[in-house]
Structures are given as structure tokens and as C-alpha cells.
């Protein structure tokens, strides 16, 4: 298998982008990635697009061909990948496998979602849950994650203040991100006093409905040198996917994500590193509780310890001795445009590891040269993890 690298990244702003169309978002992100990589459309061999539900959100299926057309890339192969909120990272995984196998040298991989063009976004999002045993009985993702939070509080003594500090830190980080949906700070009191959604979750514990797109250029490592300087090449050391039950009630435990633990252990082994070697992480904090759980599944701390670590702000950008978590602001504050999220996460790590000027106001200290992303579909039915490094 060949070594695989990222040589360019681009994204749109995330938010309620009423004036933008689905197709214009992904084309903007793709053009930015192509320009950043210093390549031309004719250099691209294939394209993958992560998208959860364009059919429900904008009434458009067959989007892979549509996007290739509007990007001026026909007749290259173009494939859509769907795995709920993990669609973007699974699209990237397919691109990585494609390049590693020798099938292609340069692949454009993007993610996009336009969520504000539908009246009932909640119903569309709920299509990623078990329709017979969850959605049919009125369960929504806020209610499912609320059950996870309640049980976690019961088992480990997590306080609402500890949980809420997650949101405070995410908004602090997002205030330094010009692409973030919520680029402003919030106080602990504001989080605690925000509107109840599903006990114990408040509004400011939840990620928003978002429009947005992101794109990466994935390239064979030797060929990458033809396009960019060596400092702009970041290597993909691991790309791992794992699955679990879609329905939350079918799990052995609702305070852990087994697929995340399995995938992270395999990814660390593939990259030949340990959790302590990670400088920076982007985790799937669709709800604050998931951020805490994923810290534990990634091996950053023991079970039940994440709340205190977060409350002590050890995950902050400027804290020394613990991986910085979600310098972008995470899903919570940077935004969660479903199919684009997995790509955006990897794009942030790419920028961080090469210390790009785009992240100068939120730059993490890079000591070991490793970053990790974890992207989750549903309540953990699909998990995809990528480890990136500035070392080949």
C-alpha cells in the first residue's frame, strides 16, 4: 500500500446560509481546496462526496454526478458516501483506500449539507436513528443523547457545571475561527441558564442546524511533492472505521461508544503511536456529553474523569500537558453541517499540524506532530477515525 497525504483544504463558512444553494457550497469548498493544493482540475482522478441526506433536505438525489458537473470535473468517477453524520469521514476513508491501492494518484474528497431549506430538519436528521424502535416512538437525537448524559451523571457523578464547561471552551475556540457558525464567547452561567431541550441538556449543550461544505485534496505521498512544498504535506497515518448498533437501547452500555474505542485502538496501532503522543484532536461533540465520552474512548483519560478535566480547562488550546480538543470550536460552536463535518474536522487538524496562517489565533503547540479526528454517525452506529502527522 502506498503512503497517502493531504495537500490542500478549503471550506465555506458554516451557518444558516439562506442565500446559498447546496451546489454552490460544495463548489466553493472544492475550488478553495484545489487552489490551496496548487493543482488543476485535470490533475484530479476521482471524487468522493460525503452527504447524509440531500434527498430530504433539498429534494436532490444523484448528487455525486451533479457536483462533478458543477465543478467542471466530468467525466471523472464521482461517488457519494452516506453514513449519517459520519458521511464525510467515510468519504475520506474511501479516498485514502483508493490512493493507497494505486487506483488513483489525486482525489478530491468533499462533504456538504444544506439543512435550512427544509421545514422540519428534526425529522430529516432522525432518519439516521432506528426508525422502528426509536423514531417511531418519538425519540430524537437530543433525547437520545440526553439519556446518555443522565446515565453518565448517575454512574460517574458528572455535574451539570462540568458538562457545561465544554460549551464554554468550544465557544472560546470558535471566537477565533472566522468560518465558525457561533464565533462568540459564552459564560458558564449562560450555558446553565439556556433553554431546556431534553433533561439534562440545555440549548447551549447542543450543536446547531448548519449549512456548509468542506473539501480536501488527497494525494499519493511522492506525487504530492510535485504540487506543494514539503511543509504543506500532511500524512494520513491511519484511517479506521467501526460499527455498532444503530439503536441506543441495544448497546451493552449507553455511557460509552464501543465503536470509537475499537476504532481508536486500531488506529493507534496502525500509526504506531499512543494517546499521549497526540497534540490535537477534533472530536464529534454533537452534544456536550459526546465530547466527554469520546475523550475517554480515545484514551485521553480514564472512564468518568473527562468531566473534571474539562472543568479544569485542560483541553484548552493554551494548556500544556494534555491534548488540545476542538480548537476549531467543534460541532458545538463551529457548526455541524452533517456530511461536511468529518471533512472539516480533518481540515482543522491539517491546518494545525502544518501551522497554517488560517489558525494563527488558535494554533496549538505541536510537539509530537500527531493529530486525531473522530467522526460519529447517529449515536455511535458508525465511527470513523483518522490520525494525521507531519511525519511520513
From Swiss-Prot:
<comment type="function">
    <text>Catalyzes the condensation of two acetyl-coA molecules into acetoacetyl-CoA. Functions in the mevalonate (MVA) pathway leading to isopentenyl diphosphate (IPP), a key precursor for the biosynthesis of isoprenoid compounds that are building blocks of archaeal membrane lipids.</text>
</comment>
<keyword id="KW-0012">Acyltransferase</keyword>
<dbReference type="Pfam" id="PF22691">
    <property type="entry name" value="Thiolase_C_1"/>
</dbReference>
<feature type="active site" description="Proton acceptor">
    <location>
        <position position="336"/>
    </location>
</feature>
<feature type="binding site">
    <location>
        <position position="332"/>
    </location>
    <ligand>
        <name>CoA</name>
    </ligand>
</feature>
<dbReference type="GO" id="GO:0016747">
    <property type="term" value="F:acyltransferase activity, transferring groups other than amino-acyl groups"/>
</dbReference>
<protein>
    <recommendedName>
        <fullName>Acetyl-CoA acetyltransferase</fullName>
        <ecNumber>2.3.1.9</ecNumber>
    </recommendedName>
</protein>
<dbReference type="Pfam" id="PF00108">
    <property type="entry name" value="Thiolase_N"/>
</dbReference>
<comment type="pathway">
    <text>Metabolic intermediate biosynthesis; (R)-mevalonate biosynthesis; (R)-mevalonate from acetyl-CoA: step 1/3.</text>
</comment>
<feature type="binding site">
    <location>
        <position position="209"/>
    </location>
    <ligand>
        <name>CoA</name>
    </ligand>
</feature>
<dbReference type="GO" id="GO:0016746">
    <property type="term" value="F:acyltransferase activity"/>
</dbReference>
<dbReference type="InterPro" id="IPR020616">
    <property type="entry name" value="Thiolase_N"/>
</dbReference>
<comment type="similarity">
    <text>Belongs to the thiolase-like superfamily. Thiolase family.</text>
</comment>
<keyword id="KW-0414">Isoprene biosynthesis</keyword>
<dbReference type="InterPro" id="IPR002155">
    <property type="entry name" value="Thiolase"/>
</dbReference>
<dbReference type="InterPro" id="IPR055140">
    <property type="entry name" value="Thiolase_C_2"/>
</dbReference>
<keyword id="KW-0808">Transferase</keyword>
<feature type="active site" description="Acyl-thioester intermediate">
    <location>
        <position position="85"/>
    </location>
</feature>
<feature type="binding site">
    <location>
        <position position="207"/>
    </location>
    <ligand>
        <name>CoA</name>
    </ligand>
</feature>
<dbReference type="InterPro" id="IPR016039">
    <property type="entry name" value="Thiolase-like"/>
</dbReference>
<comment type="subunit">
    <text>Interacts with HMG-CoA synthase (HMGCS) that catalyzes the second step in the pathway and with a DUF35 protein. The acetoacetyl-CoA thiolase/HMG-CoA synthase complex channels the intermediate via a fused CoA-binding site, which allows for efficient coupling of the endergonic thiolase reaction with the exergonic HMGCS reaction.</text>
</comment>
<feature type="binding site">
    <location>
        <position position="206"/>
    </location>
    <ligand>
        <name>CoA</name>
    </ligand>
</feature>
<dbReference type="GO" id="GO:0008299">
    <property type="term" value="P:isoprenoid biosynthetic process"/>
</dbReference>
Amino acid at each position: 500500500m502506498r503512503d497517502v497525504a493531504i495537500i490542500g483544504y478549503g471550506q465555506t463558512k458554516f451557518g444558516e446560509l439562506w442565500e446559498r444553494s447546496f451546489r454552490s457550497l460544495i463548489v466553493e469548498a472544492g475550488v478553495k481546496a484545489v487552489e490551496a493544493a496548487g493543482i488543476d482540475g485535470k490533475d484530479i482522478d476521482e471524487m468522493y462526496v460525503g452527504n447524509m441526506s440531500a434527498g430530504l433536505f433539498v429534494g436532490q438525489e444523484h448528487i455525486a454526478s451533479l457536483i462533478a458537473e458543477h465543478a467542471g470535473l466530468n467525466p471523472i468517477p464521482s461517488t457519494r458516501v452516506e453514513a449519517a453524520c459520519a458521511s464525510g469521514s467515510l468519504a475520506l476513508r474511501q479516498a485514502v483506500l483508493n490512493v493507497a491501492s494505486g487506483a488513483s494518484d489525486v482525489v478530491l474528497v468533499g462533504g456538504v449539507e444544506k439543512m435550512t431549506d427544509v421545514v422540519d430538519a428534526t425529522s430529516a436528521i432522525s432518519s439516521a436513528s432506528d426508525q422502528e424502535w426509536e423514531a417511531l416512538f418519538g425519540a430524537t437525537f437530543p433525547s437520545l443523547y440526553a439519556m446518555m448524559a443522565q446515565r453518565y451523571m448517575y454512574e460517574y457523578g458528572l455535574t451539570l457545571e462540568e458538562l457545561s464547561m465544554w460549551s464554554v471552551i468550544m465557544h472560546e475556540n470558535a471566537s477565533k475561527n472566522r468560518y465558525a457558525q457561533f464565533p462568540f464567547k459564552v459564560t458558564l452561567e449562560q450555558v446553565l441558564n439556556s433553554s431546556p431541550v431534553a433533561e439534562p441538556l440545555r440549548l447551549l449543550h447542543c450543536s446547531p442546524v448548519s449549512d456548509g461544505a468542506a473539501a480536501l485534496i488527497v494525494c499519493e505521498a511522492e506525487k504530492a511533492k510535485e504540487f506543494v512544498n514539503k511543509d504543506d504535506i500532511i500524512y494520513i497515518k491511519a484511517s479506521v472505521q467501526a460499527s455498532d448498533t444503530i439503536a441506543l437501547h441495544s448497546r451493552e452500555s449507553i455511557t460509552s461508544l464501543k465503536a470509537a474505542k475499537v476504532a481508536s485502538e486500531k488506529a493507534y496501532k496502525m500509526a504506531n503511536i499512543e494517546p499521549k503522543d497526540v497534540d490535537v484532536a477534533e472530536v464529534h461533540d454533537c452534544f456536550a456529553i459526546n465530547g466527554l465520552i469520546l475523550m475517554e474512548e480515545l484514551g485521553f483519560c480514564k472512564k468518568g474523569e473527562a468531566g473534571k478535566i474539562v472543568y479544569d480547562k485542560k483541553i484548552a488550546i493554551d494548556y500544556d500537558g494534555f491534548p488540545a480538543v476542538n480548537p476549531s470550536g467543534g460541532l458545538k460552536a463551529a457548526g455541524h453541517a452533517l456530511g461536511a463535518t468529518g471533512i472539516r474536522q480533518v481540515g482543522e487538524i491539517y491546518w494545525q499540524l502544518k501551522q497554517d496562517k488560517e489558525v494563527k489565533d488558535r494554533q496549538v503547540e505541536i510537539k509530537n506532530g500527531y493529530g486525531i479526528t473522530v467522526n460519529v454517525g447517529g449515536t455511535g452506529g458508525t465511527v470513523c477515525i483518522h490520525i494525521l502527522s507531519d511525519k511520513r
